[in-house]
Amino acid sequence: PDEIPTPELLININLKKKFGIFMQKMFCYKLNIYNQHESPWEGTRITRKKNLNSIDFLRQKILAKNLKYSILRFDKERSIEIFNNGGWHFNYLLKPEAISNKLKTFAHTEFNNEKYTDLEKIKDNINNLKDLFNRGNKFQKVNIDESFPRYIIQNKEEYKEWII
């Protein structure tokens, strides 16, 4: 899994509503390439078993934007609790070859072409902190600090290949 919820939130969880969303920092390609354009990411969801219709329901219908709708919108679930600083989402934490292969088998077939799957372009995007999909997003390198998962902090040497 590429989403890691904040352990302290899980340990002390006291869900007051039917559903919860962990708002997570998103990183791309490496552990410390921060994607500020898609942060906070609506990552890990939580609910009680009695409220779980399906995993797809949690992913597709339990959204933070639901809280902005009028209470007259009965079609939108509004019993949602937001947990800020809810963890980390590590997206495309793969070697360039694996990213290329992933894009070639991606459900969005429009990304299965050389414009996106070329190894040199992927490496260039990683080295220049650019978005794979040419959406104009520029990412930023951040230092591994106390805001990261404790395991990563304690094992930086083991993960040096994944830190720039």
Place the predicted regions along the sequence by residue.
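C-terminal accessory extensions appended to soluble enzyme cores
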Residues: 75-164
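Conserved "landmark" site that anchors the functional core of diverse proteins
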Residues: 2
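Conserved catalytic core of nucleotide-sugar-dependent glycosyltransferases
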Residues: 5-115
